[in-house]
């Protein structure tokens, strides 16, 4: 065999697909560990539910959640239609937690002892199982501290949530201006105080 019949050697380094997959997997695991070590951000939620005509066929219910993070406040609301006051309170807590785009540490304030005591494991769940399931799923990815806030005692944020929930229930739909009014009642937030990351 002559030398010119020998195929030329490929001088490029050969890397097996298996090795490349192992390297990528290793880096992915390191990134996951770094993410796990990063402390979750602390978010404050004030929520309230309202049912006008509670317990009657013509009841009109709504839920509102006010979320605060580093000076930035946003309001979320939903019209529930025919629902009880307890169901509206559960929905309000779920609404706030569902609005978060990443796992967070959450200080959740509600004037519903029913929600606080049930989610803390002190009350048994006898009714509203579908509503509790929604709240369980919403809370599952967060570290939630359930805090009772006495209603109708002049707490600015809790009162803003309460008023917005009652207004939406009366209107029968979510009006953006109602949610904006709730945020405005909390106070003016300067742009430099707000965090640039969009958590909600």
Where are the model-predicted features located?
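RNase H-like nuclease fold core
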Residues: 24-87, 98-99, 104, 171-174, ...
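Loop-to-helix element that buttresses phosphate recognition and phosphoryl-transfer chemistry
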Residues: 88-92
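RNase H catalytic domain
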Residues: 43-44, 49-57, 93-162, 169
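Acidic two-metal-ion nuclease catalytic site recognized across multiple nuclease folds
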Residues: 172-200
């Amino acid at each position: 065999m002559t030398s010119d019949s020998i195929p030329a050697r490929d001088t490029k380094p050969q890397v097996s697909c298996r090795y490349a997959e192992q390297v990528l997997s290793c880096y992915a695991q390191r990134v996951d560990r770094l993410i796990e070590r990063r402390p979750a951000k602390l978010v404050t939620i004030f929520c309230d539910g309202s049912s006008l005509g509670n317990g009657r066929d013509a009841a009109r219910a709504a839920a509102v959640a006010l979320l605060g993070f580093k000076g930035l406040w946003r309001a979320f609301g939903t019209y529930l239609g025919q629902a009880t006051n307890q169901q509206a309170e559960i929905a309000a807590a779920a609404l706030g937690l569902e609005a978060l785009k990443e796992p967070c540490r959450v200080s959740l304030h509600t004037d519903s002892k029913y929600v606080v005591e049930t989610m803390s494991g002190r009350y048994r769940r006898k009714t509203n199982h579908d509503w509790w399931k929604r709240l369980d799923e919403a809370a599952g990815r967060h570290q939630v501290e359930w805090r009772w806030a006495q209603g109708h005692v002049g707490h600015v944020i809790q009162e803003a949530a309460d008023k917005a929930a009652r207004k939406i229930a009366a209107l029968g739909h979510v009006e953006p201006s109602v949610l904006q009014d709730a945020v405005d009642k909390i106070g003016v937030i300067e742009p430099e105080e707000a965090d640039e990351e969009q958590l909600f």
